Amino acid sequence: MNYLPIFVDLKNRPVLVVGGGHIAVRKIDALLKAGASVKVVAEKLHSSLQSLTDEGKVEWIAKTFEANQVTNSYLVIAATDDNALNQLVFETAESQQRLVNVVDDQPRCSYIFPSIIDRSPVQIAISSGGAAPVLIRLLREKLEALIPPNLGAMADIATRWRSAVKTQFPQLTQRRRFWEKLFTHQSFQRLTENHQIEQAEALVEAELHNNNPVLGEVSLVGAGPGDAGLLTLKGLQTIQQADVVLYDALVSEAVLELVRRDADKVFVGKLAGKHSVKQEDTNQLLVKYAKQGKRVVRLKGGDPFVFGRGGEELEILKAENIPFSIVPGITAALGATAYAGIPLTHRDHAQTAMFITGHLKPDGNRLKWETLAQGNQTLVVYMGTIKAAELSAELQKHGKPSDTPVAIISNGTLPNQQVQTGVLSELAELAEKAPTPALIVIGEVVKLQKDLAWFGKEAVQFVSTQETLWQKPTLQNKETHWKQAA
């Protein structure tokens, strides 16, 4: 972080601006909005700046710059086209330990002005530290369109009612739920949009004395296969509204970073053969937190309804009359294979894709090997590495060719993703070397992986020339390269 983002109270504080042209006018405009006492040094003034001086809003203190003008200044701005003068202002301010900004000259700035989206009292400041001002301008335009104009009115009302809400709801969780409910209330939004402030405040008072108990709820959210960019928009919104997040071992650190900072995060992870938290205990925690009136998220790797025991957890919640919702996620069979360059279906290789788990309940039904061994299909096995030897043997026993292509994708979609490929007879050996969590893919589509890999260390390397002529890819030292045409 090259700059510390801070908001400064400039009300009635002296700010020195050296320069009287149109650039100085833009800066002075912002300073006046912040309540600063602006003093200008310039040989002559821009017409609009002259008007501000005539109105007594700005003080024109001198035509030439002197070092003593900096002494009592809170901030200093140099906004001239005279490079030597700008340098003098910068050096003088630095020597007196005053924060100084030389406009459009980043090396001579001890502070910079961000781009501002103003919905006072709500303000959003964005900056690239001077690296890409055009990019920041485009971003600001998008944010201006996204952020409602009534945000300031909503914040003003919240300021006036903050003390009363704190008295009515002494617990932080209660207050948070009240404000979230109010700010998303359609009538409240409509009234503030229409500048009907008295009616909006009447609605606040009515909601404040609404004695209906706050019901807890549980949302099952699919965290996706690992890459935080694959988390759905609704999933992101839900985890940022949660009071408590119960997460498992397959949820990546990048996704956990997106959880609201003050939410309680409870690990309820389990790995095949290494249960650290029993499923029954997880179920009871969901019930417990929901009955405390909290907004609970059960955050699961992949999709909650694909080998995630989501159905089992919802049955418990249903029995306890606890409201629930489901936010689907991208399951590993879709995300990891896509990042590995393995299409699940292909007209030449597979017309069916089948997902199975290698981690069955001890008393569960056996797999239908005859069905799994059929051709023209892709078989994806979750949590299957510890059963790789049995999987390989049974599939071959039931007619699957021993040279059927297989892949094991470890840490799919993450920067440390690894893809090992081989044939069915080698599956057990490959599984022993594969880091977990891992996904097994069996089928002819695996043949395409070397040509279609695009992510991570195994990605196809495209080597360009001016002619952009290419030959087919060849394998060299177990890496895929595109050979430049002669």
UniProtKB/Swiss-Prot annotation:
CDD domains associated with the record: SUMT
Listed pathway(s): Cofactor biosynthesis; adenosylcobalamin biosynthesis; precorrin-2 from uroporphyrinogen III: step 1/1; Cofactor biosynthesis; adenosylcobalamin biosynthesis; sirohydrochlorin from precorrin-2: step 1/1; Porphyrin-containing compound metabolism; siroheme biosynthesis; precorrin-2 from uroporphyrinogen III: step 1/1; Porphyrin-containing compound metabolism; siroheme biosynthesis; siroheme from sirohydrochlorin: step 1/1
Active site, renumbered: 248 (proton acceptor), 270 (proton donor)
Residue positions binding NAD(+): 22-23, 43-44
GO MF annotations, alphabetized: NAD binding; precorrin-2 dehydrogenase activity; sirohydrochlorin ferrochelatase activity; uroporphyrin-III C-methyltransferase activity
Region feature (Uroporphyrinogen-III C-methyltransferase): 216-486
A Pfam match: TP_methylase
Modified residues (Phosphoserine): 128
UniProt KW keywords: Cobalamin biosynthesis, Lyase, Methyltransferase, Multifunctional enzyme, NAD, Oxidoreductase, Phosphoprotein, Porphyrin biosynthesis, S-adenosyl-L-methionine, Transferase
EC number: 2.1.1.107, 1.3.1.76, 4.99.1.4
SUPFAM superfamilies found in the cross-reference section: NAD(P)-binding Rossmann-fold domains (SSF51735), Siroheme synthase middle domains-like (SSF75615), Tetrapyrrole methylase (SSF53790)
Binding-site list for S-adenosyl-L-methionine: 225, 301-303, 306, 331-332, 383, 412
Catalytic activity: uroporphyrinogen III + 2 S-adenosyl-L-methionine = precorrin-2 + 2 S-adenosyl-L-homocysteine + H(+); precorrin-2 + NAD(+) = sirohydrochlorin + NADH + 2 H(+); siroheme + 2 H(+) = sirohydrochlorin + Fe(2+)
GO biological process, one term: cobalamin biosynthetic process
Record-linked Gene3D superfamilies: Cobalt-precorrin-4 Transmethylase, Domain 1, Methyltransferase, Cobalt-precorrin-4 Transmethylase, Domain 2, NAD(P)-binding Rossmann-like Domain, Sirohaem synthase, dimerisation domain, Siroheme synthase, domain 2
InterPro entries from the UniProt entry: 4pyrrol_Mease, 4pyrrol_Methylase_sf, 4pyrrole_Mease_sub1, 4pyrrole_Mease_sub2, CobA/CysG_C, NAD(P)-bd_dom_sf, Siro_Cobalamin_biosynth, Sirohaem_synt_dimer_dom_sf
Region called Precorrin-2 dehydrogenase /sirohydrochlorin ferrochelatase, residue ranges: 1-204
PANTHER family: SIROHEME SYNTHASE (PTHR45790:SF1), SIROHEME SYNTHASE-RELATED (PTHR45790)
Function: Then it catalyzes the NAD-dependent ring dehydrogenation of precorrin-2 to yield sirohydrochlorin. Finally, it catalyzes the ferrochelation of sirohydrochlorin to yield siroheme.
Family: In the N-terminal section; belongs to the precorrin-2 dehydrogenase / sirohydrochlorin ferrochelatase family.
Descriptive protein name: Siroheme synthase
Gene name of the encoded protein: cysG
